[in-house]
């Protein structure tokens, strides 16, 4: 890639950041499409996020991706949110139009697209959703919009629990999907939810390095062959949860699917051009 003074900058703001495949994926796509943009990762936490946004404006960056732990905080620093982003209460994409910042959430659309591309119809189905952070709630919101009948959200009683309750209220008031929130410590309720679920989705960082030997499913017998198990974590590619699911005979979707489809939508939002999907799948090894 021959970067010139005509190139515009796109960023990714997260902490930690060095594990991310997004810079490699987006830069390969930008180079293939012949577009004058370059994509760079920046270590930005909640404390430094406000200053980073001011920097984005000052440098006239085209936009930025937003990842943990900034997805919910970022909503406070944009001028406009899409209806889906309002429902989620978190964003993963900011587009800068001459200083006017628009916030989007492509995590949900990306993950649901990955599920649909696998041939699974979510309409009328029940999802057990692990976690209440930005990615998890985005998946839940998009699933509700696209026809899930019920979402059983499980989260620890941490700083996200009240946010989970608020999220459930927004979805229940604005869609036909019924969302309940339960403490993950209630293992009996978790077991009962899995027994009747069609989809289990991990929206937490459990399974991601350095937690690669952990899973929120402590008893593999809770997983049944009729269950579709999906991951947001892609590093490592094969998480402990996915290993458990395959041992139990479940169909699985790894975190590459969400990474690919959410990134494709981001690419188009920033550039106005189509994402070179098949090329990126090949060079990144996502189809392997």
From Swiss-Prot:
One of its GO terms (biological process) is amino acid biosynthetic process. Keywords: Amino-acid biosynthesis, Aromatic amino acid biosynthesis, NAD, NADP, Oxidoreductase. The keyword NAD applies. GO terms for molecular function: quinate 3-dehydrogenase (NAD+) activity; quinate 3-dehydrogenase (NADP+) activity; shikimate 3-dehydrogenase (NAD+) activity; shikimate 3-dehydrogenase (NADP+) activity. Belongs to the shikimate dehydrogenase family. Homodimer. This is Quinate/shikimate dehydrogenase.
């Amino acid at each position: 890639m021959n970067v010139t003074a005509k190139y515009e900058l796109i960023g990714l703001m997260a902490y930690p950041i060095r594990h991310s495949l997004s810079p490699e994926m987006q830069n390969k796509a930008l180079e293939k499409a012949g577009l004058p943009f370059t994509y760079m990762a920046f270590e930005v936490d909640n404390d430094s996020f406000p200053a980073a946004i001011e920097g984005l404006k000052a440098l006239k960056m085209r936009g930025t991706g937003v990842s943990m732990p900034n997805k919910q905080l970022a909503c406070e620093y944009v001028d406009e949110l899409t209806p889906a982003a309002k429902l989620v209460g978190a964003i993963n994409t900011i587009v800068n139009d001459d200083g006017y910042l628009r916030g989007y959430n492509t995590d949900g659309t990306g993950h649901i697209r990955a599920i649909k591309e696998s041939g699974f119809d979510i309409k009328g189905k029940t999802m057990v959703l692990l976690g209440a952070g930005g990615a998890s709630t985005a998946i839940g919101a998009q699933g509700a919009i696209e026809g899930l009948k019920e979402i059983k959200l499980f989260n620890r009683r941490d700083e996200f629990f009240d946010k989970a309750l608020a999220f459930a209220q927004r979805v229940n008031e604005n869609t036909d999907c019924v969302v309940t929130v339960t403490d993950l410590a209630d293992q009996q309720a978790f077991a009962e939810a899995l027994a009747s679920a069609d989809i289990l989705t991990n929206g937490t960082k459990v399974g991601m390095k350095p937690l690669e030997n952990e899973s929120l499913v402590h008893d593999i017998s809770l997983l049944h062959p009729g269950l579709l198990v999906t991951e947001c974590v892609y590093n490592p590619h094969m998480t402990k949860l996915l290993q458990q699911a395959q041992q139990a005979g479940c169909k699985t979707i790894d975190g590459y699917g969400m990474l690919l489809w959410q990134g494709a939508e981001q690419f188009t939002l920033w550039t106005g051009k189509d994402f070179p999907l098949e090329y990126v799948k090949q060079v990144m090894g996502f189809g392997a």
